[in-house]
Amino acid sequence: MKRLSLAIIFVCCTLAMAAQNEIKVNFQGTAPDIMDFAWSYVTAPDSEEDGEYDESTNALRKSLELYRKGQSQPEGFTITVDKKAGYILVVSKQDGFTNKWEMCYWNMADKKYKLFACCVELSENGKRSGPGQYDGLNFYRYDNTTKTMSVYDAGVEVDYFNISYSLPRTGKDIIVTQWSENGREKWQKTLKWNGSRFNY
């Protein structure tokens, strides 16, 4: 029953995120960088109807906003922004819970598009045991011509139970890790990027 309830929550969150059919990416200069992609992503409303943000997006948005202003992060938050690598990592640790947001982007093989990825994961007392309410691994394809990004099927079958995903800071492959109930690593595999999708 608990698994079913969590699945329903995840579906609801997925549907809400799917409402962001197309996101305009605003930037200065000749091309957007990772901060431009991330900021456009977190400032796009969860719902076209109510225009509100969920709790997780609000936390990430606040962290990015403070970074953009050159201000200190809230207590328990750390942020890593590597513009050269096209990678951002935000970590929040509160009361034994750790929220991790990873974002990255790179050029697709045809050079007409870029892939933007965002991964949100929750762990408790250092253990990755099941999905948090806002967990998700989402992909968007950015169109260099229209300067917008839309939801993209990158070929990844996402599973959130005892599974974690590590987005690349270098390279273009995703590391998938399965964890046992006691929080120990059981196995790892690599999702290989082929220029347009991931292969298992």
Model regions: which residues?
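Mid-length scaffold segments of soluble, non-membrane domains
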Residues: 109-153
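Short, solvent-exposed loop/turn segments at conserved positions within beta-propeller repeat blades
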Residues: 30-33, 81-84, 130-134, 182-186
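Structural signature of eukaryotic scaffold interfaces centered on beta-propeller domains
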Residues: 102-111, 164-170
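Short aromatic loop motif centered on NTY/YTY
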Residues: 148-200
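Terminal domain-start segments
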Residues: 20-106
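Short, surface-exposed coil-to-beta transition loops
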Residues: 97-101, 116, 126-128, 132-137, ...
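Bacterial Sec-dependent N-terminal signal peptides
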Residues: 1-22
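Short beta-strand segments that buttress and anchor functional surface loops
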Residues: 89-92, 117-123, 175-181
